[in-house]
Amino acid sequence: MKIEWFGHSCFRINDSLVIDPYQDESVPGCPLLRLSASRAIYSHQHADHYGIGCVTIIPNDGADFQITEIPSWHDNQHGALRGPNTIHIIEHEGLRIAHLGDLGCELNGEQKKLLQNLDILMIPIGGFYTIDAKQAAVIVGELSPKCTIPMHYRGDNFGYDELGTVDLFTKYFNEAEIKTVGHILELDSDLPKVAVMDFPR
């Protein structure tokens, strides 16, 4: 299995499932998306996660994904500030992947139970609109995924100014646990505890 990151919170799994594509020019510094897949899923309907027109759907390409939706909030006031958020658990080829979308609050007990035994956790870390780096590190400790991919943060030349940088998250882990990878993460090799991805420029 392979995972591609296109910046912000947008990923594609095995060329078949796109998660949270962003609309054109909605995220500073991120490339325009022109993707194809058999399916696209969205955590919520804000422009930086809901680029419906940026994904060409090619049906019946044989991909078999089992997807579970977990309701959550985009803020810590039960959605009063930014509305609802959907966490997705994706099961494919014997692996469990969770994408937390724009999670803006702590996980409750039931959510934590559903999010156990993860191979990959995609988690926002930038703060302001979502949980911040410290809160994200706590959640990683609670869920103990095999590998965590940080998302929704600011880099040197991409992302919103209000967001924190990835080093604010990685400082909570040992250097040996962190690996910087490219645009594509292959899941058939040994996975680091934290995989910091890049996206095509």
Region spans (language model):
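Active-site-proximal loop/helix segments of hydrolase catalytic cores
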Residues: 79-143
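Short secondary-structure boundary segments
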Residues: 44, 125, 151-153
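Conserved acidic residues
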Residues: 37-38, 119, 146
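Metallo-beta-lactamase
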Residues: 47-94, 171-191
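Pre-active-site segment of Zn-dependent metallo-hydrolases
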Residues: 9-60, 71-85, 103-114
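Active-site-proximal beta-strand elements of phosphoester/diester hydrolases
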Residues: 2-6, 17-22, 66-72, 89, ...
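Binuclear metal-ion centers of metallo-dependent hydrolases, dominated by the metallo-beta-lactamase
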Residues: 3-4, 81-82, 147-201
